Amino acid sequence: MGMRMMFIVFLLVVLATTVVSFTLDHVLGLASEGRNAKAIDNALDQRDPKRQTPGCCWHPACGKNRCGRR
């Protein structure tokens, strides 16, 4: 293998590693963020009876209906 071919293989390995790493971080990060938001929201609901509205999520990271908040 020539020097140019080795450099191209190196670049392809770096690119593939970066793409896989970013994809896994993105997918796993969103999943864990949603679980954490739900756990935080449930804990807050237990402490504050005014927040116990079905279908609402008061945590900013939650993707559900935010019950009229801006």
Curated annotation (Swiss-Prot):
Protein known as: Alpha-conotoxin EIIB
Family per record: Belongs to the conotoxin A superfamily.
Function in brief: Alpha-conotoxins bind to the nicotinic acetylcholine receptors (nAChR) and inhibit them. This peptide potently blocks muscular nicotinic acetylcholine receptor (CHRNA1-CHRNB1-CHRNG-CHRND), and has no effect on neuronal receptors. It is able to totally displace [125I]-Bgtx from the Torpedo receptor with an inhibition constant (Ki) of 2.2 and 0.7 nM.
Post-translational modification Cysteine amide, affected residues: C67
Compartmental location: Secreted
Propeptide stretches in the record: 22-51
Database matches in InterPro entries: Conotoxin_a-typ
UniProt GO cellular component terms: extracellular region; host cell postsynaptic membrane
GO molecular function, one term: toxin activity
S-S pairs: C56-C62, C57-C67
Residues bearing PTM Pyrrolidone carboxylic acid: Q52
Residue numbers bearing the Hydroxyproline modification: P54
Lineage: superkingdom: Eukaryota
Tissue: Expressed by the venom duct.
